[in-house]
Amino acid sequence: MYEAAVAHYLATGKRSFLDIAIKSANLLCETFGPEEGKITVAPGHQEVEIGLVKLYRVTGDKRYLDLSQFFLDARGKYDKYDRSSEDQFRNGAYWQDHKPVLEQDEAVGHAVRATYKRRTL
């Protein structure tokens, strides 16, 4: 949604969709992060990180950039996975959460995630 809202805003200059995306991103910023009482895990899709960066670029709100970085840094740190399992759901690979982003050298998990890996290289 964030990428679409930014594209719509850049193409039309209209803020209606962008304002909805901002409201949603603000909720993410209030809910996720390293601070006490917030959820400290990475989302299942890296799409949110890309979208938050694009929102930052059009709004200048650094919270979006910071949250995107937090999500990327959180990958590979969730301690409830069974890292020895070959099952991608049990070891975190399905969600690209099996090891830190900078250590991921191949696209794994659901096929849609291959585009995120390629876009970030």
Predicted features by range, described:
Residues Y2-L121:
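Glycan-recognition and catalytic cores of secretory/periplasmic carbohydrate-active enzymes
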